[in-house]
Amino acid sequence: MARKRVLVADDLAPVLDTVSSLLSQSFDVVDMVSDGRAALEATLKLEPDLVVLDISMPLMSGIEVAEELQRQGNKAKVVFLTVHEDHDILKTCRAAGGLGYVIKVLMDTDLVSAMNEALAGHMFTSRFPSEEQTP
């Protein structure tokens, strides 16, 4: 089976490097970009199976990118990678077509799972570390 093609968008180079390392064993990373406009253009041009989007990026937010992809009928699955532990933002991401919502501090354990779930058409949401109960 062919490896799934993934585009990654985040404005922080260290995050792009980490994501690339996490995905290199299982996915074909077709491009890594650092702003929302580049993410939109690259997704429309390269037609990846899945797009990993940071929410807070220059030029266009990840949410705006996802909304535009949805408007244009693009079939790429969307997973958001974010620092935001916020249920309202999560709802906005879902409305924009996002199937995955991964908190950056959990990307080592959650990102690949979220991507696989999204590719299968299922939703995945990281637990919010700030809501964890302490004994």
Give a label for each model feature.
Residues 9-10, 33, 51:
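Conserved sequence signature across two-component system core domains
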Residues 10, 54, 82:
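Active-site residues of response regulator receiver
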Residues 13-31:
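Two-component/phosphorelay signaling modules centered on CheY-like receiver
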Residues 35-38, 61-64:
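Acidic catalytic/metal-coordinating carboxylates
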Residues 46-52:
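Active-site beta3 strand of CheY-like receiver
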Residues 57:
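Receiver (REC) domain active-site loop signature in two-component systems and cognate sites
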Residues 88, 106-119, 123, 127-133:
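C-terminal output helix
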